[in-house]
C-alpha cells in the first residue's frame, strides 16, 4: 500500500507515477524547452500538427477568449531508440508570463467557484479543445493509447486535470478516458477514482469546492472527505504551528493560510513522504504530518499533530522531519516518526510507536524518570522502550535517552539526565543502567529459552524456536517462520513487525497480548475478525501478507482488547 496508490499503480509503481506527475507539474511553472532529468522532453506544436498560440519555450496558451491566460505543456518520454513511450500533459497553475496572465488566471479561479454551472468541469475543453484533439491524433499515429498519457497540474492546473478527466469519455473520441490523472492542490475533485487528488489538508485552495460546487464551507475550513483525495496530509509550517496566527480563521481569504499552497512546499514535503521507510504503511486517508519549518524554527517548534481546522484524525499518525535538526513529538496514540538527517529530538506520550532517528546524533526525551520505563537492546540496532502502561516504542539510530529525575529541594525541582546508548547499557556520567534482561538470536535459526520473569526473547532472522515457562515474557520472533511456546503465567506479549513470516504460538492465553507494529496492510483499525479462520483445533490470524497460528485456540477466545495493530 501507499498514500499515493492509484488504480493499479501500487507501492513502487505508485511512487514512480507520483514522481513523474510532480516533475511535469513543476516543469509547467518553469518551462525551458530542454529535456528533464527524468527523461521528459517537450513536444512542439509543429510535430503535433497544431496551430495556435505557442510561447518561446513551447508553452501552449488557451484558445478561446476568456481562456487565453491558460497554459499547458506537452512532453514525451522516449526509449533509447527514440521511440515515443508516453505523453505528459501538464497544466500550469495560477500565474503566467506577466500580470495580464496572472489576472486572467485569477478570473478563471473565481468563475470556477461562483461562475456559470459547469465552468470548472468544462475548463479544459474551453481552453484547449483543438490542442487535445491534435495530441490525441499524434499519439495514435505513434501507436499510443490513452493509457500512455499522464495528466498533471497544481492549483488551477489541478482543476484542469480534473476537468479533462471528467470530459474524457465524451470528447476527443474518448481517447483520454483511460489516461492517468494526478492533480496537486486542486480546488475541484472529479467523481470516482479517475483522478488522484493530492493535497495538504491545511492548504486553503485544496478541496475548496465540494466537487465543483461552491458552498458555505468554501470560505472557511473545508475538510470534508473526498473519495479521490488524500484527506489528512498536514503541511506543518510556521503558520500551522502558531497559536497566535490561528486566532484568525483558516480561510482562502486569509493570506497566512496560503503558506501551505506553494508548489515548492508540495515538492519538498511530499518527496520526503515518498522516500520514507514508512511509505508502504500509509494509505490514502492516513494522517501524515510533514514538517516544512524553516531552519530557524526547527530548533524551537515541536512538530506534532495539532489537528487544527480539520475533522478529527483517526488511526496511526506519521510524522516526517526534515534534513535538519528537528523536534518531533508523537501523541497518546500510535505514531511512526522519522527524523532523517540532522540531530533530532523525539518525544512521545504513549501507545505503540516506531521512531527512526536517521543520521546524526538523535535523542529520545522520555519526559519522565527512567525508572518508569524498561529499556531493552535487541543486539541488532533496535532499542525497545516500554512505558509503565505497557506501550512500546521501537527505536533505531537513537544515541541517547533523556529522563527527568528528582533534583534538589527533596525532588521538588527536577533535572534532565542524558543516558548514552551503549552496548552494555545506558550510561549517564559514570553510572551505568543495565538493559532489561533479554536473549538475542542472530540471522539463523535459534533456540532460545527465557530465564527470568519479564524476559525478552529476540529470534531475529531464520526460523526460531522461542520457549518460556516464566511470566510476563515478550516474544519477538523477527523474520522467518518462528514457533513460540509459553507455559508460564502472567501476561505475555507476542510482538510482530514488518515481514514477520508465518509463526505459530503454543500456550496462548486470554491474558496475553498480540502486538503487530509496522506490518504493511494491517495498521490501526485493522478488523482482525475478517481475517480469522479455523483449522482443526487451531486459529489462523492473517495479518497483511503473513499469519500467526494460535495452536489449540478457538477463534471466539480472541478479543479486541488482546490484539494491537499499529
PLM feature spans:
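Surface-exposed beta-strand/loop patches in extracellular or lumenal glycoproteins
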Residues: 365, 513-517
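Short His-Asn-centered micro-motif
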Residues: 91-92, 152-153, 182-186, 348-349, ...
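N-terminal low-complexity, Ser/Thr- and acidic-residue-enriched intrinsically disordered segments
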Residues: 1-43
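A conserved cap/lid and substrate-binding interface adjacent to the catalytic center
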Residues: 44-150, 172-178, 189, 308-310
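Short, exposed beta-strand-loop hairpins at the edges of beta-sheets
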Residues: 549-553
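Serine hydrolase/lipase
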Residues: 2-3, 84-86, 123, 133-150, ...
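Glycine- and aspartate-rich repeat motifs characteristic of hemolysin/RTX-like Ca2+-binding segments
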Residues: 293-366, 371-393, 401-504, 528-530, ...
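Gly/Ala-rich beta-loop-alpha elbow adjacent to hydrolase catalytic centers
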Residues: 153-157, 161
Amino acid at each position: 500500500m501507499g498514500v499515493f496508490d492509484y488504480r493499479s499503480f501500487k507501492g513502487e509503481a505508485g511512487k514512480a507515477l507520483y514522481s513523474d506527475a510532480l516533475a511535469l507539474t513543476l516543469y509547467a511553472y518553469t518551462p525551458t524547452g530542454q529535456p528533464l532529468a527524468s527523461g521528459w522532453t517537450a513536444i512542439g506544436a509543429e510535430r503535433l500538427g497544431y496551430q495556435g498560440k505557442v510561447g518561446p519555450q513551447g508553452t501552449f496558451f488557451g484558445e478561446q477568449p476568456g481562456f487565453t491566460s491558460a497554459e499547458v505543456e506537452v512532453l514525451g518520454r522516449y526509449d533509447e531508440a527514440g521511440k515515443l513511450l508516453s505523453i505528459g500533459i501538464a497544466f500550469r497553475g495560477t500565474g503566467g508570463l506577466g500580470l495580464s496572465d496572472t489576472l486572467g488566471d485569477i478570473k478563471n479561479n473565481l468563475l470556477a467557484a461562483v461562475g456559470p454551472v459547469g465552468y470548472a468541469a468544462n475548463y479544459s475543453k474551453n481552453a484547449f479543445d483543438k490542442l487535445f484533439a491534435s495530441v490525441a491524433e499524434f499519439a495514435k499515429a505513434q501507436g499510443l493509447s490513452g493509457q500512455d498519457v499522464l495528466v498533471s497540474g497544481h492549483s488551477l492546473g489541478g482543476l484542469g486535470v480534473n476537468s479533462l478527466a471528467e470530459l474524457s469519455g465524451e470528447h476527443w473520441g474518448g481517447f483520454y478516458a483511460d489516461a492517468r490523472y494526478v492533480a496537486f492542490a486542486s480546488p475541484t475533485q472529479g467523481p470516482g477514482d479517475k483522478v488522484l487528488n493530492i493535497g495538504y489538508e491545511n492548504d486553503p485552495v485544496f478541496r475548496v469546492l465540494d466537487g465543483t460546487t461552491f458552498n458555505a464551507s468554501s470560505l472557511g475550513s473545508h475538510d470534508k472527505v473526498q473519495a479521490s483525495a488524500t484527506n489528512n496530509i498536514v503541511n506543518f509550517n510556521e503558520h500551522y504551528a502558531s497559536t497566535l496566527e490561528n486566532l484568525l480563521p483558516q480561510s482562502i481569504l486569509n493570506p497566512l493560510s496560503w503558506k501551505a499552497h506553494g508548489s515548492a512546499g508540495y515538492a519538498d514535503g511530499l518527496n520526503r513522504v515518498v522516500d520514507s521507510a514508512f511509505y508502504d504503511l500509509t494509505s490514502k486517508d492516513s494522517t501524515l504530518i510533514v514538517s516544512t519549518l524553516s531552519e530557524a524554527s526547527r530548533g524551537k517548534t515541536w512538530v506534532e499533530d495539532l489537528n487544527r481546522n480539520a475533522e478529527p484524525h483517526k488511526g496511526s499518525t506519521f510524522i516526517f522531519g526534515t534534513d535538519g535538526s528537528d523536534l518531533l513529538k508523537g501523541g497518546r496514540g500510535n505514531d511512526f516518526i522519522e527524523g532523517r538527517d540532522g540531530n533530532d529530538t523525539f518525544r512521545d506520550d504513549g501507545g505503540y510507536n516506531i521512531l527512526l532517528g536517521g543520521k546524526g546524533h538523535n535523542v529520545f526525551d522520555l519526559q519522565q524518570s527512567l525508572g518508569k520505563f524498561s529499556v531493552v537492546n535487541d543486539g541488532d540496532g533496535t532499542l525497545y522502550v516500554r512505558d509503565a502502561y505497557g506501550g512500546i516504542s521501537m527505536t533505531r539510530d537513537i544515541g541517547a535517552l533523556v529522563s527527568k529525575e528528582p533534583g534538589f529541594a527533596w525532588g521538588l525541582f527536577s533535572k534532565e539526565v542524558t543516558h548514552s546508548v551503549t552496548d552494555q547499557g545506558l550510561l549517564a556520567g559514570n553510572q551505568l543502567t543495565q538493559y532489561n534482561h533479554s536473549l538475542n538470536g542472530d540471522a539463523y535459526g535459534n533456540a532460545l529459552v527465557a530465564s527470568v520473569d519479564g524476559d525478552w526473547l529476540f529470534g531475529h532472522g531464520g526460523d526460531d524456536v522461542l520457549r518460556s515457562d516464566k511470566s510476563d515474557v515478550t516474544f519477538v520472533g523477527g523474520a522467518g517462520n518462528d514457533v513460540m511456546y509459553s507455559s508460564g503465567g502472567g501476561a505475555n506479549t507476542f510482538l510482530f513487525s514488518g515481514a514477520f513470516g508465518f509463526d505459530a504460538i503454543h500456550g496462548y492465553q486470554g491474558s496475553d497480548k498480540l502486538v503487530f507494529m509496522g506490518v504493511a496492510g494491517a495498521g490501526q483499525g485493522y478488523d482482525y475478525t475478517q481475517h480469522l479462520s479455523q483449522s482443526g483445533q487451531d486459529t489462523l490470524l492473517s495479518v497483511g501478507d503473513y499469519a500467526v497460528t494460535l495452536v489449540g485456540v478457538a477463534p471466539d477466545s480472541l478479543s479486541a482488547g488482546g490484539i494491537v495493530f499499529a
